[in-house]
A protein has these predicted regions:
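Conserved N-proximal alpha/beta basic substrate-recognition cap immediately N-terminal to
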Residues: 43-126, 362-368, 381
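Glycine-rich adenosine-cofactor-binding loop
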Residues: 10-17
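Glycine-rich phosphate/pyrophosphate-binding beta-alpha loops
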Residues: 150-152, 276-292, 355
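Active-site nucleotide/adenylate-binding loops and adjacent lid/helix of ATP-dependent enzymes
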Residues: 105-181, 201, 230-242, 246, ...
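Short, small-residue-biased leader/transition segments that mark boundaries at the very start
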Residues: 1-4
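Peripheral (often C-terminal) accessory segments that flank ATP-dependent C-N-forming ligase machineries
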Residues: 116, 133, 301-398
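Phosphate-binding core of ATP-grasp and ATP-grasp-like enzymes
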Residues: 171-179, 186-230, 238-271, 276-284, ...
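Short, polar loop motifs at secondary-structure junctions
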Residues: 34-40
Length: 398
């Protein structure tokens, strides 16, 4: 009879999960997807789709059990990571434990873990009620954020005590756990560092650093691009890599695809702001593959099935980036156009909206119009584009 097809359950069917779905299909795996949005574009590519929310741990567990899947994968989605861990732990599938993944995914637990292990960490206190905040505890500015939100949603920089309550309520509205973190503002020097990596059985096998780009005209916290490679001195890069490897080793996580956010202050202190226990959104794995030839999608899918993939990065003199098309005010999307001045190479593009769709201002990654994956001949070319993207790409919003 037929050779048994390995079955993988992939949580979510958005554009960002499509690379994982396509890769798994290309390997001949039987792909099952689930989320509560049947129209998501990834489901059409899967073998089976179930209308179950990716955050409903017990419903997803029941589904995985009834289908006896061989692996479960969270790819490029924060809220689904604890679900994948929970299911893999209960069913004995490849993966990490629920508690371990939550420690990395929930900001207050992450800050506590870093503090206990002697990493640099801004002062941070979680609160469930605004009344519990003692203003005397804080020197402004502070950052106010949900402990568990994804896509940079619900974050405010607060410069005076008068604005704390509204920032708290705003953050709370984006928190499923209903916990808000207040933390010292880190005065970083240079761009925020981002990127993805993979930690194997007992060591960091791969990491790639990029520089986050934000649109200061809107709110300055939602990344609208990432440039690769990051310009880091080799000594600073080694220190960052050492910190990341040490954090993951101490946590007990293994076979972990992760997304990272790192800040550096004027004293060259390194702050691991986030190690998200899943690959990055915004097509970061795809950009990294153009730059390094390392297929993070393959690594993540195979790890979910207990398989390993050799990692062999190649050298590349070109520069790569993603750019998120976004609106500075709400309106109706009427398409975009590359100007005559646009002389860069588009390796791929994903447009999420149709002409005539409503779009909001770019206050979270959920308001992304689309993503352009760009290749540049030099760092100078890349910087030229990002200095004023609107000179090269026109967006029509009415």
């Amino acid at each position: 009879g037929d050779v048994y097809k390995r079955q993988i359950l992939i949580l979510g069917g958005t554009h960002f999960q499509i690379p994982a779905i396509k890769y798994a299909k290309s390997r001949g795996y039987h792909v099952i997807t689930c989320d509560y949005l049947p129209d998501n574009p990834g489901h059409k590519l899967a073998d089976e789709y179930y209308n179950i929310s990716t955050t409903d741990k017990n419903a997803v567990l029941a589904l995985a059990r009834s289908l006896s899947v061989d692996g479960i994968l969270c790819f490029a989605s924060d809220p689904a990571a604890p679900t994948a861990a929970y299911v893999s732990e209960v069913l004995g599938l490849p993966g990490n434990t629920f508690d371990n993944i939550c420690r990395f995914g929930e900001k207050h637990l992450w800050r506590q873990f870093l503090r206990e292990n002697g990493f640099n960490v801004p002062k941070a206190i979680p609160y469930q009620r605004a009344e519990d905040i003692d203003v005397a505890d804080w020197c402004f500015p502070v950052m106010v954020k949900p402990v568990d939100s994804s896509g940079s949603k619900g974050i405010t920089k607060v410069t005076s005590a008068l604005d704390l309550k509204s920032a708290f309520d705003y953050a709370l509205s984006y928190s499923r756990l209903k916990i808000v973190l207040i933390e010292e503002f880190v005065e970083r020097v240079g761009p925020q560092i981002g990127g993805d990596g993979f930690y194997g059985k007992d060591k960091l096998e791969f990491v790639c650093y990029g520089e986050q780009v934000v649109d200061e005209r809107i709110n300055g916290y939602v990344p609208c691009g990432m440039k690769f490679p990051a310009l880091l001195s080799s000594s600073l890069e080694q220190r960052i890599t050492h910190d990341i490897e040490r954090a993951i080793r101490l946590s007990g996580l293994h076979d972990l695809s992760f997304n990272l956010e790192v800040m550096i202050d004027k004293a060259e202190n390194i702050y691991l702001m986030e190690i998200g226990p899943r690959n990055g959104g915004n097509c970061i794995p795809e950009v990294i593959q153009y730059y390094t030839d390392v297929n993070l999608v393959a690594i993540a899918v195979e790890a979910a099935l207990g398989n390993s993939v050799p990692v062999c990065p190649s050298n590349n003199t070109k520069c790569y980036a993603y750019y998120a098309l976004h609106a500075s005010k709400e309106g109706i999307y009427r398409g975009y156009e590359l100007e005559k001045t646009f002389r860069f190479n588009i390796r791929n593009s994903y447009i999420f909206l149709k002409n005539g769709d409503k779009i909001g201002a770019f206050l979270g990654s959920n308001q992304t119009i689309g993503i352009l994956l760009l290749e540049f001949d030099s760092r100078k070319e890349m910087d030229t584009f990002f200095d004023s993207p609107e000179r090269y790409v026109s967006l029509y919003i009415e």
